[in-house]
């Protein structure tokens, strides 16, 4: 089980296939997604990675968190998240996960906070049908109707679908296909819509309901100390020693 990443939703656009068909995609951008800490079975009871993105102002970071960032030798991060991983998928602390951590064609699950829409009625919030347009109905065409009956049950049950605040909920959309990646600009293009507003934080991880492709990088694709991850780069051959003329 590999780590996920935190990305920022840029917006939607479309890309064209070789057959000329257009595919609507959501553009997600990774902004220096670095591993901040490890969670181990011995110390924490589970195995996970804590990753962070964005650059936070030092004045907005608590003294305790400054110390943790200093130990990891990374700049203070604006957004943090934990991802459960297997022990063989731990990425070194301080490494930066890149966009080619995911490959085109694989499926991912994305998690975000939905757009807030304020107070909404039953028809918009729960897709109620409303009352009739005529035949004795006046004023209350979009009302939800009776909620509690008379003597039986004589009350409105808890969790009854009623008008109220709509949006600003944590939602996960599963099985979105990765159409394209751009490691140089840190972009991931996924097919379809992603919950949340443009500029919102999105968590992207491998799909839990789809089989992971055999050619995905393990434990992941990352840069360590300004270079690509050791697990993904072959050692460069040594240059032959030059002989000096006597």
UniProtKB/Swiss-Prot annotation:
GO terms for molecular function: rRNA binding; structural constituent of ribosome. One of the primary rRNA binding proteins, it binds directly near the 3'-end of the 23S rRNA, where it nucleates assembly of the 50S subunit. NCBIfam families: L3_bact. Methylated by PrmB. Signal peptide: none annotated. Residues 234-246 have a biased composition (Low complexity). GO terms for cellular component: cytosolic large ribosomal subunit. Coiled coil: none annotated. Keywords: Methylation, Ribonucleoprotein, Ribosomal protein, RNA-binding, rRNA-binding. This is Large ribosomal subunit protein uL3. Residues 140-162, 215-246 are annotated as: Disordered. GO terms for biological process: translation. The modification N5-methylglutamine is found at residue 151. It comes from Methylorubrum populi (strain ATCC BAA-705 / NCIMB 13946 / BJ001) (Methylobacterium populi). Belongs to the universal ribosomal protein uL3 family. It comes from the Bacteria.
């Amino acid at each position: 089980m590999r780590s996920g990443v935190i990305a920022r939703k840029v917006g939607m656009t479309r890309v064209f296939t070789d057959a000329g068909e257009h595919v609507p995609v959501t553009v997600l951008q990774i902004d220096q997604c670095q591993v901040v800490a490890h969670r181990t079975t011995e110390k924490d009871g589970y195995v996970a990675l804590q990753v962070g993105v964005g650059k936070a102002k030092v004045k907005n970071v608590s003294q305790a968190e400054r110390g943790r960032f200093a130990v990891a030798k990374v700049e203070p991060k604006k957004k943090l998240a934990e991802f459960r991983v297997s022990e063989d998928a731990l990425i070194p602390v301080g490494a930066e996960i890149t966009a080619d951590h995911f490959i085109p064609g694989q499926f991912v699950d994305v998690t975000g906070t939905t757009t807030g829409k304020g107070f909404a009625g039953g028809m918009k919030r729960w897709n109620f049908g409303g009352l009739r347009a005529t035949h004795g109905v006046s004023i209350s065409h979009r009302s939800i109707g009776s909620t509690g009956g008379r003597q039986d049950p004589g009350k409105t049950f808890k969790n009854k679908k009623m008008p109220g605040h709509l949006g600003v909920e944590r939602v996960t959309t599963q099985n979105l296909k990765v159409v394209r990646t751009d490691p140089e600009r840190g972009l991931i293009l996924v097919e379809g819509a992603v919950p949340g507003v443009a500029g919102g934080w999105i968590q992207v991880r491998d799909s839990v309901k789809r089989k992971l492709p055999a050619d995905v990088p393990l434990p992941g694709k990352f840069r360590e100390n300004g270079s690509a991850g050791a697990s993904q780069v072959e050692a460069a051959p040594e240059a032959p020693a030059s002989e000096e003329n006597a």
